[in-house]
């Protein structure tokens, strides 16, 4: 289970935005420098999205040459190093980004995701909590989902449930969050709401070993033998070597 970083394009600025006619140097004006910086960031993100991290560094470095304090450039470079499994360098870049823009919810959310991957759960929680304060952040539902996932790792299921509920209030179309709610409620023996959340998950989520096992367990609670059998066959066919299949066999 991983926390999803909300990596988005920063500005819709193309490289052609930096080109001017004549002998005028666009980097001599504030507007020209801003456009050049943003174009380089866009180019770097394009390489990053295609999985070419080495090539992504070149335009991102150029962006930082133009604007050494660019939070967006540092944040993008942090994701590059995170992808390359260079945690120390990624951490440094995230910190530089936040030094320039300490309230940037996107950077805080991405940094929280990085800290989660590093199992630094207390730090991740604090960064994500800061990100959640931005009520206008368009990916706020993802922040609450991430807070819920971190809370689970901190052994705080009640707190996790509150965050998952907040996430779903902001965006109902999140199968992964619905599955987390179904799992928590099943463990609390709240079977009716657990099934409701599971049905919400099933409407838009692809099944995996974990979800199939939960579906089997819920079907058994409600004595739905056909559904339990169907999920059992899928689990056997698709995930025969999984821990979930072993648990399913043991529970027969």
UniProtKB/Swiss-Prot annotation:
Mode of membrane association: Lipid-anchor
Q: Where is the lipid attached (N-palmitoyl cysteine)?
A: 18
Annotated signal peptide: 1-17
Q: Where in the cell is it found?
A: Cell outer membrane
- S-diacylglycerol cysteine: lipidated where? 18
* Highest taxon in the source lineage: Bacteria
Q: Which UniProt keywords apply?
A: Cell outer membrane, Lipoprotein, Membrane, Palmitate, Repeat, Signal, TPR repeat
Output a single Gene Ontology CC term carried by this record. Answer: cell outer membrane
TPR repeat start and end residues? 32-67, 84-101, 104-133, 139-171, 174-203, 208-235
Major subcellular site: membrane
Q: Keyword Membrane: yes or no?
A: yes
* Keyword Membrane (UniProt): yes
- Disruption phenotype annotation: Mutant shows an impaired export/assembly of the fimbrial subunit PilA, and accumulates this protein in the membrane fraction. In addition, loss of PilF expression abolishes multimerization of PilQ.
Q: Offer one Pfam family short name for this entry.
A: TPR_11
Q: GO MF terms on file?
A: TPR domain binding
Biological-process GO terms, alphabetical? pilus assembly; secretion; type IV pilus assembly; type IV pilus-dependent motility
Known NCBIfam families for this protein?
type_IV_pilW
Question: What does the UniProt record say this protein does?
Answer: Essential component of the type IV pilus (T4P) that plays a role in surface and host cell adhesion, colonization, biofilm maturation, virulence, and twitching, a form of surface-associated motility facilitated by cycles of extension, adhesion, and retraction of T4P fibers. Plays an essential role in the outer membrane localization and assembly of PilQ into secretins which are dodecamers of PilQ.
Return the domain comment text from this UniProt entry.
Answer: Contains six tetratricopeptide (TPR) protein-protein interaction motifs. TPR1-TPR4 form the minimal region required for secretin assembly and function.
Known PANTHER family for this protein? BARDET-BIEDL SYNDROME 4 PROTEIN, PTHR44186
Subunit details: Interacts with PilQ; this interaction is essential for assemby of PilQ into secretins.
Q: What is this protein called?
A: Type IV pilus assembly protein PilF
Taxonomy-wise, where does this protein's organism fall, top ranks first?
Bacteria, Pseudomonadati, Pseudomonadota, Gammaproteobacteria, Pseudomonadales
